[in-house]
Amino acid sequence: METEEEMKESSISMVEAKLPPGFRFHPKDDELVCDYLMRRSLHNNHRPPLVLIQVDLNKCEPWDIPKMACVGGKDWYFYSQRDRKYATGLRTNRATATGYWKATGKDRTILRKGKLVGMRKTLVFYQGRAPRGRKTDWVMHEFRLQGSHHPPNHSLSSPKEDWVLCRVFHKNTEGVICRDNMGSCFDETASASLPPLMDPYINFDQEPSSYLSDDHHYIINEHVPCFSNLSQNQTLNSNLTNSVSELKIPCKNPNPLFTGGSASATLTGLDSFCSSDQMVLRALLSQLTKIDGSLGPKESQSYGEGSSESLLTDIGIPSTVWNC
């Protein structure tokens, strides 16, 4: 019989301690079946080349599994012998002092090189007694041999020697939080990589006083367009708008309309405002004419012939201002 010290020395945690940093015990399902469970079953009571600890699941609660079985910090690997409820039956007794393991879902096949080598059963631990047990976050994958890799019956002297390999882990919210954080980081990264989506335009909805800066120049505001595919006409509009944003036309006579005053002063100011705005629009049309001359016939055709009003409307200037 092996002493406790010998078991510790042969445990996976001790083997990992001798490996370079970064190496972890992370076997695939077929490796667990063929390279570990198969050897355990064939060696029977003899010590396999690499030993996982042995746990009696009927006498051990999931949270009491020895820490030496913990591999990688999140999974517990160990051998166990299935305790059959009846000597002549195949049903397994999975009850503990405080609860029981309940199978969930269908068993999954484990293949190696296209051949069936084992099965994996998923079980969840319930506290209390069936059928009123309370479901917990403890999950177990039970691996058993199947197919041609199953040892012959004469190698099993009793039902208790029906070996299985178990992987136990505790489901918690850490994985969800990590995924959320990753998504958040991804969203932030994606947003940071996008170019600035600011298109200048003249905003006629805001207060008139905000059109003028301290040096009485017209101010072009910025607008964030929708995320949509730009057609050829929309691209042209953007070019026209950029040209408008480069205009900085002085306003010679600031009007009472912008600073407040009486009704008569406001009407007088409105006439002066329209006159001043016409200066802006003339300069604007001059710029548009230059751009229209540089466009091909197909590009300029979409605006119509002599449709100055449609040009002004497309870049955000209402026709009511032009008709002052």
Curated annotation (Swiss-Prot):
Ubiquitinated. The interaction with SINAT5 mediate its proteasome-dependent degradation. Residues 19-171 form the NAC domain. InterPro entries: NAC-dom, NAC_dom_sf. GO terms for molecular function: DNA binding; DNA-binding transcription factor activity. One of its GO terms (cellular component) is nucleus. Pfam families: NAM. Induction: Induced by auxin. A motif (Bipartite nuclear localization signal) lies at residues 120-137. Predominantly expressed in the root tip and in lateral root initiation sites. Also detected in expanding cotyledon, and in leaf primordia. Transcriptional activator that mediates auxin signaling to promote lateral root development. Activates the expression of two downstream auxin-responsive genes, DBP and AIR3. Dimer. Interacts with SINAT5. This is NAC domain-containing protein 21/22. It comes from Arabidopsis thaliana.
